[in-house]
A protein has these predicted regions:
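Nucleotidyltransferase catalytic core that binds NTPs
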Residues: 1-164, 168, 172-225
C-alpha cells in the first residue's frame, strides 16, 4: 500500500495595505485623490495616512524651523486637520505612530513595525520628488524589501511613462536598479506649500482643501502672515 503525499495548501497572500506618509501641513485634495487612486489600483482595502511627528528632513516640533526656514505647524493641529480631511471615507485611516514616536521618525522603522504586526504586503505611496530623495533616507534598500513603492507622477509627467529608478550614493546605490510602479491618476499641481502661500496672501483655497480643513485653518489662524 502506497501513501500518497499531498502538497500543503498555499499560504494566502495577505491583503495589501497602502501607506501615505507626510507632514500634511495642511492635507489637501491632492492627498485624497492620490490615496484613492493608489488604493483602487493596488487592490488595498485601506490606506493608512502616517502624519510625521519629527521627520528626518524637517523639524516636527513647533518653534524649530524646517530646512526651508518655515515654522512647521504643531503635530496636534496637523493631526486634527487630517482627521477632518479623511472623515466620510471608510477606506481611509490614520496611523499616528510617527507622532507618538520620540525623536526623529524614519520610514524604515515604521515599515519594520508594520511587518512585525503581520502587515507583510505593504504599498508605500511616494511622490516623484520623494522617490528621487529616497537614496538619502535611512536604509533605502531595506525600504524596497519591505514594501512595493508606488509613485505619483509629476503633474507634467504622462501617467503612461515609466518612473525613474531611485539613484544615489553609498547604500543608495543599491536601490538604483530597483523599479517602481507608477500610480495612474489625473495630474494635480497641488501642494501644501501652495496652500500655505495662498492662505498667507488671503487667496481662496476652496476646492483645493476640504471645507472642514479650511474652517479649522481659519479658526486656529494657521498660515497667516
Amino acid at each position: 500500500m502506497t501513501t500518497q503525499l499531498t502538497a500543503p495548501d498555499p499560504q494566502p497572500v495577505p491583503a495589501p495595505l497602502a501607506l501615505l506618509g507626510g507632514t500634511f501641513d495642511p492635507p489637501h485634495i491632492g492627498h485624497l485623490v492620490l490615496a484613492e487612486c493608489a488604493r483602487l489600483q493596488f487592490g488595498a482595502q485601506t490606506v493608512r495616512f502616517l502624519p510625521a511627528g519629527d521627520p528626518y528632513k524637517k523639524s516636527g516640533t513647533t518653534g524649530l524651523p524646517t530646512a526651508n526656514g518655515q515654522q512647521p505647524t504643531a503635530a496636534t493641529d496637523r493631526l486634527a486637520m487630517l482627521r477632518l480631511a479623511l472623515a466620510g471615507n471608510p477606506h481611509f485611516a490614520i496611523d499616528d505612530r510617527e507622532i507618538r514616536r520620540p525623536g526623529p521618525s524614519f520610514t524604515v522603522d515604521t515599515l519594520e513595525e508594520l511587518h512585525a504586526e503581520g502587515h507583510t504586503n505593504l504599498i508605500l505611496i511616494l511622490g516623484a520628488d520623494a522617490l528621487a530623495d529616497l537614496p538619502t533616507w535611512k536604509h533605502p534598500a531595506r525600504i524596497f524589501e519591505l514594501a512595493t513603492i508606488a509613485v505619483a507622477p509629476k503633474p507634467w509627467q504622462p501617467t503612461e511613462s515609466q518612473p525613474p529608478s531611485a539613484a544615489g550614493s553609498g547604500e543608495g546605490q543599491g536601490v538604483r536598479a530597483r523599479r517602481t510602479e507608477q500610480i495612474n491618476m489625473p495630474p494635480l499641481a497641488i501642494s501644501s506649500t501652495l496652500i500655505r502661500a495662498r492662505v498667507a496672501n488671503g487667496l481662496p483655497v476652496r476646492y483645493l482643501v476640504p471645507d472642514a480643513v479650511i474652517a479649522y485653518i481659519a479658526t486656529h489662524n494657521l498660515y497667516a502672515k
